[in-house]
């Protein structure tokens, strides 16, 4: 009997013919399944490369692996690790790790980078994605040749001047050519070039601007290919830093580091092609210490401000505002932190920024690693200003204030005090244009932190008029607040007394017009109140060392736009430079600290005037007492030197004029002899008329003419007849 499979008999054959090739891809057939397939990029995001682990042999590899696993499992118990073996069976000093997700891997990088495994081993952690971006070493790399030391001479030669004269540099046009010159300030005389004429003054010395280093050791110039530092008595080239199209430069406080910035030539909104626009160099060696991406630091392709990095006084730390984060709609939120870097490793301190919500600005103390910050207010959160101790990150003192529209901070040079100015509104309204209008008036306050007091005391000073400017006496206990408006600005001098809860008003000086800035002399005691970019151009010179501040002089420099004290506080300069008000006579004027004019120079297209800074010198208490004890003798010596110099200058002028007159007499005698020799010839040419004959005195006629210079009406005395009538 034969079995028949009826189903098979009726079923159609769907088999592919021999040699058939299917052209339908899996992406079309099962896209929902392939979407879940892991990619290499996702895997790399979860992997972290760690270098710096101990190099051990095969006998100790197992123990090392168990210790490393304990360290890593503190961050994530699900971590997987692999130690690449060496040919001998030991390890190579590197570790490969895989984490649960990208967030865990990023946290591991921040936590393990710089982690001290023991006293001899410190980890360096990088994600696999970052490792792929590293360029391979060049096949043609060779060991750099040892460079000879470039000796430019004594960098502080100018400090050895017997009269302690200050120097300054100016940038202006000379015969139509941009020129930079370094001059020595000669009290009572015109400034002299500080060196040979061909070395101390040069045409096209810089392509944009020049800058002194903080201690005055170097003069820096900007060029298309980079930065050049000049030093020594001959202003020789000391260092060169290659940075194409560099725009801005800045020094660290002790001249150890130089920061340069060049805007990226090509970049998109994601910051591509821009990885080293911000660079930090070692000034002494010329080594590039660190390069930053502007986009990674700020979230933008351009810097928001300059200088961008703020340095601590000892250069151990430098900081900038953290890049703003974005919400789900890619909108920028307010900045909520400070990125603090260590200059020893040029890495972010503890691998993460310091979180401070809505932070607007910050400044380092001039004498300690204390950081002052200001966080702006929102509708729900008040503004906060306070002090942060680094590296402990302890908040020494803070205060919160509602409805703050504007704020500024002012450190005292001694670092003992910090002043915060705040403008506080009652109510605000938003206009259709988006502008903010403050309704109900504003109040103005100055809050002062006393850093040297226990628990950092805080005092408040309400101001009766709008705030304009503020400045501290650098070493004393006084400060000046400029209040009012452009029509009437009043400088007020206050003093902080011991055990007082508020500053005491010492003097309220005469009000002036268009005053907009106050400047204490670097050594304190004297104060300058400036009316910059005004038609009057007044400057008040005020002595604040007395029990009551006293104005000593008022000077005028119409339309000046810059004013500077010299580093010693002996001289003050006012300048009218390019970029100021149109119509101003460009040039500078130098005054004594009391306001007596010493020098006036008009220059074509004056662009810059900068005093040469002096390095800080700390004298012992014994030396200070010795100087105070001999102050009268020293002052008498300087007065005699000034008098001798004036006499010497007068004698030099007289001698110079005598030489000029003698040379003129020689030329006149020679021309007179030539004139007498050709007199007969001239008479014959004039038909016998001697037009050069001297006139006889008898031919002159004396005539007197009386001219009334002025007239006035007076009542004539009455006669006897008029009196009788």
Curated annotation (Swiss-Prot):
Phenotype seen when the gene is deleted: Extended lifespan in adults.
Residue ranges occupied by any RRM domain in the UniProt entry: 46-130
Primary subcellular site in the record, as a coarse category: cytoplasm
Keyword Repeat in record: yes
A GO CC term assigned to this protein in UniProt: eukaryotic translation initiation factor 3 complex
Compartment list: Cytoplasm
Gene Ontology terms, MF aspect: RNA binding; translation initiation factor activity; translation initiation factor binding
One Pfam family this sequence matches: eIF2A
An individual GO BP term: regulation of translational initiation
Swiss-Prot/TrEMBL WD repeat ranges: 202-240, 242-280, 354-395, 462-504, 510-552, 554-594
Subunit text: Component of the eukaryotic translation initiation factor 3 (eIF-3) complex.
Family statement: Belongs to the eIF-3 subunit B family.
This protein's name: Eukaryotic translation initiation factor 3 subunit B
Provenance organism: Caenorhabditis elegans
């Amino acid at each position: 009997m034969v079995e028949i499979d009826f189903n098979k008999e009726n079923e159609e054959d769907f088999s592919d013919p021999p040699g058939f090739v299917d052209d339908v891809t899996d992406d079309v057939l099962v896209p929902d399944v392939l979407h879940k397939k892991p990619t290499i990029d996702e895997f790399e995001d979860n992997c972290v490369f760690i270098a710096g682990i101990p190099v051990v042999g095969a006998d100790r590899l197992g123990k090392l692996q168990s210790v490393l696993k304990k360290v890593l499992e503190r961050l994530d118990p699900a971590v997987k690790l692999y130690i690449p073996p060496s040919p001998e069976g030991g390890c190579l000093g590197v570790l490969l790790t895989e984490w649960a997700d990208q967030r865990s891997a990023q946290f591991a990088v921040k936590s393990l980078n710089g982690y001290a495994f023991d006293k001899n081993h410190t980890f360096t952690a990088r994600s696999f994605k970052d490792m792929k971006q590293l360029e391979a070493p060049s096949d043609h790399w060779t060991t750099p040749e040892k460079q000879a030391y470039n000796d430019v001479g004594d960098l502080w030669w100018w400090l050895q001047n017997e009269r302690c004269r200050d120097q300054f540099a100016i940038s202006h046009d000379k015969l139509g050519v941009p020129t930079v010159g370094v001059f020595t300030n000669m009290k009572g005389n015109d400034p002299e070039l500080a060196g040979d004429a061909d070395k101390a003054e040069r045409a096209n010395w810089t392509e944009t601007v020049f800058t002194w280093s903080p201690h005055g050791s170097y003069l820096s110039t900007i060029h298309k290919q980079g930065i050049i530092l000049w030093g020594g008595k001959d202003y020789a080239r000391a260092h060169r830093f290659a940075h194409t199209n560099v725009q801005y430069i800045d020094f660290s406080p002790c001249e150890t580091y130089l920061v340069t910035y060049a805007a990226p030539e090509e970049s998109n909104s994601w910051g591509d092609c821009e990885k080293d626009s911000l660079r930090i160099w070692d000034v002494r060696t010329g080594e590039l210490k660190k390069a930053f991406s502007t986009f990674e630091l700020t979230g933008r392709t351009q810097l928001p401000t300059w200088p961008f990095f703020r340095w601590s006084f000892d250069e151990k730390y430098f900081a900038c505002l953290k890049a703003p984060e974005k919400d789900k709609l890619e909108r920028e939120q307010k900045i909520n932190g400070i990125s603090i870097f260590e200059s020893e490793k040029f890495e972010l301190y503890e691998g993460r920024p310091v979180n401070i919500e809505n932070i607007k600005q910050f400044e380092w103390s001039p004498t300690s690693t204390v950081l002052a910050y200001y966080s702006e207010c929102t509708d729900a959160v008040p503004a906060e200003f306070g002090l942060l101790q680094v590296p402990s990150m302890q908040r020494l003192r803070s205060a919160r204030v509602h409805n703050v529209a504007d704020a500024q901070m002012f450190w005292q040079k001694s670092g003992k005090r910090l002043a915060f100015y705040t403008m506080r509104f009652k109510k605000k309204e938003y206009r259709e244009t988006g502008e903010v209008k403050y309704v109900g008036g504003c109040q103005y306050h100055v809050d002062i932190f006393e850093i040297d007091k226990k628990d950092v005391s805080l005092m408040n000073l309400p101001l009766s008029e709008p705030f304009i400017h503020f400045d501290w006496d650098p070493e004393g206990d006084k400060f000046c607040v400029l209040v009012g408006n452009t029509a009437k600005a009043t400088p007020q001098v206050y003093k902080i007394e011991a055990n007082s809860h508020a500053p005491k008003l010492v003097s309220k000086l005469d009000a002036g017009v268009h005053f907009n800035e106050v400047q204490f002399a670097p050594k304190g005691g004297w104060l300058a109140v400036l009316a910059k970019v005004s038609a009057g151009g007044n400057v008040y010179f005020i002595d604040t060392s007395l029990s009551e501040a006293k104005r000593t002089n008022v000077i005028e420099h119409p339309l000046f736009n810059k004013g500077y004290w010299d580093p010693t506080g002996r001289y003050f300069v006012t300048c009218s430079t390019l970029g100021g008000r149109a119509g101003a006579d460009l040039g500078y004027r130098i005054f004594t600290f009391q306001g007596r004019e010493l020098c006036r120079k008009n220059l074509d297209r004056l662009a810059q005037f900068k005093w040469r800074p002096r390095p800080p010198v700390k004298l012992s208490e014994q030396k200070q007492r010795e100087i105070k004890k001999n102050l009268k003798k020293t002052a008498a010596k300087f007065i005699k030197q000034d008098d001798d110099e004036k006499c010497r200058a007068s004698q030099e002028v007289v001698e110079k004029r005598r030489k000029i007159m003698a040379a003129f007499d020689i030329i006149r005698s020679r021309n007179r002899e030539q004139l007498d020799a050709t007199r007969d010839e001239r008479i014959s040419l004039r038909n016998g008329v001697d037009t050069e004959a001297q006139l006889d005195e008898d031919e002159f006629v004396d005539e007197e003419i009386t001219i009334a210079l002025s007239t006035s009406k007076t009542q004539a005395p009455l006669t006897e007849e008029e009196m009788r009538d």
